[in-house]
């Protein structure tokens, strides 16, 4: 529509510890998106899944851009024709069911796929022909194809997009690594773990039990250090907050950046014990940083020195 936008995004990795499945209640999704917006974000990437109708409705109301994906995170794309047909059917179903929602601006085939990218590009072209109201991409990370209308990745042919190297500096950006001719979004920026907050264990009253945190707590007690648990949590959490500030600001300084997708605002217990969030797995604050303070480095307008 001719309006420039810089996507300040987070991942939603389908983490629902109480139920094991996403809520179908608009009010719950309104709570989640309002929380995300309060930290300066305008965009949510659903990591290799598509949320229910309630999420799109809430996003329309709150004002949140969404990226839905097919349930594809595989190393051998194109090997099984029946599986490929399933993905195409799912693609059309998602577009038919949710395509009228204005919040639904991006769609991707899935996460870090490998294999036959001709198959992935064919899906992109079919989606574009079926419903041209949003932008499409073959895969989040790994390979850029000519049909891509945006590209999300760690790296291009010229180097890293995400901020995993170098020393903190106010003169540090990623302009030199954005040579692709479509908007480039930095993939899964952040990923800085902190020590667990053992006070969260009591929140796990549903289908998921926090047995990993129970093991960590028992080990710490066995070594006579349990009384230091909160110190470890707050010290490492403060470090993570500072690192995310550096990540966000470096990409905001990059005039060629299309945006970023932070991993994460929320913890990701779906793949090991990834305590990467300033919010816990329930989208609730850990008390490490206020939304107001976080927005100083993540907002439509951020004061930066170079």
Regions found by a protein language model. Give the residues of each.
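A eukaryote-biased signal for short, well-structured alpha-helical docking elements
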Residues: 270-299
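Surface beta-strand/loop "capping" patches
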Residues: 162-164, 168-171, 291-306
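Short, conserved loop/turn and helix-capping segments at secondary-structure boundaries
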Residues: 23-26, 81, 85, 283-288
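N-terminal carbohydrate-binding accessory modules
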Residues: 1-36, 57
